[in-house]
């Protein structure tokens, strides 16, 4: 649905911290977005996490979910950016390794003024590898 160039028009993140390659689905009415990240051995974080046993840091999986959410939510807040206010109930169920394809599935649960509450899950091969609930504050860049 949206390629990397369209994603980069909507959120400020750039390499090496842009963690979404493609938006697969965006349902603004249901407030659901699905994104994709192809994890390669060339990712900067694999240099130190962990040498000889590369595993994607769990916090970066959560960041990828947040970036997907930003693509959808920020259309309603031009010129602003979402910042984490809280991360709750984060669970990491399986390691993510080079060669995996992450599928982010995020849903907005509530928007109140400049606060957004959401929940998300990330999958590799239909298995949940991470999940969390988030609160964002929408603020000036």
Curated annotation (Swiss-Prot):
It holds the Pfam family FabA. Keywords: Cytoplasm, Lipid A biosynthesis, Lipid biosynthesis, Lipid metabolism, Lyase. The active site is at residue 49. GO terms for molecular function: (3R)-hydroxyacyl-[acyl-carrier-protein] dehydratase activity. InterPro entries: FabA_FabZ, FabZ, HotDog_dom_sf. The keyword Chloroplast does not apply. Its EC number is 4.2.1.59. The keyword Isomerase does not apply. One of its GO terms (cellular component) is cytoplasm. It is found in: Cytoplasm. It catalyses: a (3R)-hydroxyacyl-[ACP] = a (2E)-enoyl-[ACP] + H2O. GO terms for biological process: fatty acid biosynthetic process; lipid A biosynthetic process. It comes from the Bacteria. Belongs to the thioester dehydratase family. FabZ subfamily. PANTHER family: 3-HYDROXYACYL-[ACYL-CARRIER-PROTEIN] DEHYDRATASE. Involved in unsaturated fatty acids biosynthesis. Catalyzes the dehydration of short chain beta-hydroxyacyl-ACPs and long chain saturated and unsaturated beta-hydroxyacyl-ACPs. This is 3-hydroxyacyl-[acyl-carrier-protein] dehydratase FabZ. The lineage of its organism: Bacteria, Fusobacteriati, Fusobacteriota, Fusobacteriia, Fusobacteriales.
């Amino acid at each position: 649905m949206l390629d990397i160039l369209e994603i980069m028009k909507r959120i400020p993140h750039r390499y090496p911290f842009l963690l979404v390659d493609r938006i697969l689905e965006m349902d603004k009415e249901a407030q659901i977005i699905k994104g994709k990240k192809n994890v390669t051995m060339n990712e900067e974080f694999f240099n130190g996490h962990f040498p000889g046993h590369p595993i994607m840091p769990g916090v970066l999986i959560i960041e990828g979910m947040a970036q997907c959410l930003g693509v959808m939510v920020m259309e309603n807040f031009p010129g602003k950016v979402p910042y984490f206010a809280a991360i709750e109930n984060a669970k990491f169920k399986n390691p993510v390794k080079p060669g995996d394809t992450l599928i982010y599935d995020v849903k907005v649960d509530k928007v109140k003024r400049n606060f957004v509450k959401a929940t998300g899950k990330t999958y590799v091969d239909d298995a949940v590898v991470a999940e969390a609930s988030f609160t964002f504050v929408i603020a000036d860049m």
